[in-house]
Amino acid sequence: TMGEETVAELQIPDVDDVVKGVEALDVDAGDDVDEHDADLAPQAAGGAPSSVNMSPADAKVEAVALIDDDRLLQAARLLRRHAVDVPIANPLDATDAKLNAFVPKAAVMEDLIASLKADPKTPGTEWLVQCEHSGRRDVSIYYRMDNETQTKLTARIESPIHKDMLVPFLSVLNESELYKSWLPNWTMPRLRVRRSDKLSQTGRCSQVVLVTVDLPWPFSSRECVLDAWGVDDIDASGDICVLVDSMKPGESMRCGSIVPDVDESGVVRIDFEAGFLFRKLPGGWEAERDAARAAASWFGTSGSSGTSKGGEGANDSRRSSLDEEGHSDDGHHAESSPGDQILVSVQMYMDPKLSYVPTSLLNFVIRTVLYTMWCMLLRVAEQVRDGKSESHQKSIREKSTELYDWVRERTGAMLARLFAGGNVVTA
């Protein structure tokens, strides 16, 4: 069964109005970030001016200010530029302690971003193609298994979305307490999200969430405590990033609270790590998609290509159903110009803490669960965009001043930067 929300109107400002109002940076937004140029971004954003002559002490203070403004990656670049090594061996004050707590996460995020920006089809990457589905929602899924255990899964999912989906998508990700209302559940085999509780709001766009998932018999339920960090790297690279990392019992959250022990007998805590990346659709994406569609049409695979194996009939039917569900959305079309689109990518690693994973369960997760959950996420974001999710509408309204007004302003700056030079297309 899948949770459905009541229909209500949600007023989201027109993206182009936000873009035009921001009048953001008149620069090209490439993927490569010059450390010196990135260092100057705080001045444009209202922070203290940067200087090549800044002392290490001043660099640390400025880095903390950047962290407080959700610009962790810029803080890490600033510290590297001024030769401040983190972790700091002998922290002297609260500034040092904060840098030690936050900055190491930047390296993890940078590695994930580098992986997400690399072509998964490059020889030697070990990615296997699960599906490259072309339709109203373009979805590409890749995966690889740990060679030693064959139980640890790394998956990568990519979809281009229209620019007016950016704020709704981010809001659905942020509203973790509503996950249980829309994430799909299965009875055969049993797989469902039973609990999604926010333990702490640790920052403007950072939180700690407890998620419990029931697995098929004879496996016990699994859960993880997820520390999610939203990072604004718009002024430096044009990107928005989210890092999700599991926490262990007894660890301290950034708010000072302690991660609790498992509160149910038989439930097993697992390891999970993920990174979301929102960036301009790379050049050539459309051509590759069209080529995949042409190949799929030639071989009669109805718009889906990849390593589909036996038993995929039900999955293909489900994919078709998910794809068709969205066609009732008035005023929104399947085709978009590359100048309208943002590429959303996520890479996730999970260790289920199992000595053996049956092939049937593994195939179910790889072939069905990942695709269905991703399409449901896109579908709910579409509902939010169209004002059709009362629960999300209520949360967005309640958090406008503290969060969503800022999200709209920053995403407006991102879109203006990415589509500068008169390439912003009216929605």
What is each of the regions a protein language model found here?
Residues G3-A427:
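Eukaryotic helix-grip
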